[in-house]
Amino acid sequence: MAKDIRVLLYYLYTPIENAEQFAADHLAFCKSIGLKGRILVADEGINGTVSGDYETTQKYMDYVHSLPGMEELWFKIDEENEQAFKKMFVRYKKEIVHLGLEDNDFDNDINPLETTGAYLSPKEFKEALLDKDTVVLDTRNDYEYDLGHFRGAIRPDIRNFRELPQWVRDNKEKFMDKRVVVYCTGGVRCEKFSGWMVREGYKDVGQLHGGIATYGKDPEVQGELWDGKMYVFDERIAVDVNHVNPTIVGKDWFDGTPCERYVNCGNPFCNRRILTSEENEDKYLRGCSHECRVHPRNRYVSKNELTQAEVIERLAAIGESLDQAATV
């Protein structure tokens, strides 16, 4: 059965004059054609994921390709049965990718148009995965890695991408003299991060051109050597990559069983992304810790209108109580 919705993933590092006004004009156009999605605009370029029917997405691609400097922008296209977004957002930011360094400033930032790692095709990247002398580094957030990753890729001990440069500096002696290849969802983070690694003194740095999204669609590699699913920042949450021998690597936060279902912790002040089944979400009140389960603003409790007696009953079932000491 034909799928009616297309999801477009794209980015482009290119100077945008008066980027704030560009963002406002871009939002107006997107709304005028009924497009849904999330787009970041900065002086350094544009990064977005949008969705709509064939006619709407075609209008959008034609519009973007008509803009100065964006004639060759590369859209990665998925076909889906449902919209990937509920609303349309276009926001101006100082950068479309922020490295999060204390010594980083916007005037002395990495410009991928000048400094970036060598581009690797899916075939070349697969060869790198099989090369025991090559270090493969996942540059994404921890919860993205936990849902799926390339076989043998290093999972940095970080929570999010902004912590990665410091982690690399702290572990410099492990990688400095080796070939390092990096990857991310669509390529936008790696463009800048691989450039930063080059500036740090790494001599042999490569990046997966087009990211995981392109690797999974390549007719030759067909996503092989990818384990799990790819995390995406829209309503789909997870998409398939490996079309040869797919596996599940995600583990339920509470019992460690195979799982590919993400939810946010019920405590709005925590909001950690956790993998869990519906059964365990109910059992543990969607709280990643005791403190989050008993938090007075637990969203799971309020959404399901649980009484205090019901909360106490569920806590007792897992050996906890309202007044016990926090375990985090």
From Swiss-Prot:
Catalytic reaction annotation: uridine(34) in tRNA + AH2 + O2 = 5-hydroxyuridine(34) in tRNA + A + H2O
Sample GO molecular function, one term: oxidoreductase activity, acting on paired donors, with incorporation or reduction of molecular oxygen
Residue numbers annotated as active site: 184
EC numbers, comma separated: 1.14.-.-
GO biological process annotation, one example: tRNA modification
Entry keywords, A to Z: Oxidoreductase, tRNA processing
Boundaries of every Rhodanese domain copy: 130-224
Keyword Oxidoreductase set for record: yes
CDD domains: RHOD_YceA
NCBIfam families: PRK00142.1-3 (NF001135), PRK00142.1-5 (NF001137)
Protein family according to the UniProt entry: Belongs to the TrhO family.
Entries under HAMAP family matching the protein: TrhO
Function description: Catalyzes oxygen-dependent 5-hydroxyuridine (ho5U) modification at position 34 in tRNAs.
Protein name: tRNA uridine(34) hydroxylase
Organism: Streptococcus pneumoniae serotype 4 (strain ATCC BAA-334 / TIGR4)
Gene: trhO
